[in-house]
Curated annotation (Swiss-Prot):
Name the record gives this protein: GTP cyclohydrolase FolE2
Residues under site feature: May be catalytically important: 188
Gene that specifies this protein: folE2
Enzyme Commission number, as recorded: 3.5.4.16
Similarity-based family: Belongs to the GTP cyclohydrolase IV family.
Higher taxonomy: Bacteria, Pseudomonadati, Pseudomonadota, Betaproteobacteria, Neisseriales
Amino acid sequence: MQLLKASDIISHLQIDGIFPGGNAIPCTHLNNYMNIKEKQLMNTIADVQSSRDLRNLPINQVGIKDLRFPITLQTAEGIQSTIARLTMTVYLPAEQKGTHMSRFVALMEQYSEALDFAQLHRLTAEMVALLDSRAGKISVSFPFFRKKTAPVSGIQSLLDYDVCLTGEMKDGAYGHSMKVMIPVTSLCPCSKEISQYGAHNQRSHVTVSLTADAEVGIEEVIDYVEAQASCQLYGLLKRPDEKYVTEKAYENPKFVEDMVRDVATSLIADKRIKSFVVESENFESIHNHSAYAYIAYP
């Protein structure tokens, strides 16, 4: 019997929208199709992971972690390319020895759509079907770039933000969440009040994790946070801009407590958002430790 290569198997997995090209195979029939092809392989090659396990312990999540992969993003401001780190896992029943590790990468190798929440839903559903599981989770972490305009000179430059999109499916029910880390400037109100000359200020990382009933854009979360900071950050500033941001921060001092409360107030006002966590870490310029605050809602 002629052996089938893995690429021969994958070439038949033409799922509309995920595996484009050729004849589409309905997702509901995918696992039966995979089983037929795998039986041909197993006639010659032992398939240890498909054997039974006798320890009677299911595994909540098993799969691959930190797969680096190029992706394109569909956002409110257009399409951009970036490099993502993916963690892809599925539920493994007690009687099954192992999952099909190669299928996670095979799925991504065939994926070519611009990623948004709708595509993440489809990708998660296809993974669960491909791995013949009842539950699965995909987390996609990546640097997100936004073009910013300096406040005085008008010069433009890019600023990066850390983003993680997560899709999770269990027994047919799907949910997604988003996490965004926004770097900003904070200036200490106490230092301003007691000092004759200036006040200590520093970079802060504000992290927002949220779930929503309707899609909330990455850019919207960034805007919520930057509006509450002592001042925004910019990739490139000229001297007039530097003067502006220094004075802007001085006129808008914020404790770490102020930061999380003000951001939380903005998020609560957005009725699309069901739940969130806001964290702020201020890298104190006068200490060798950070100031930190955390709010969870509801």
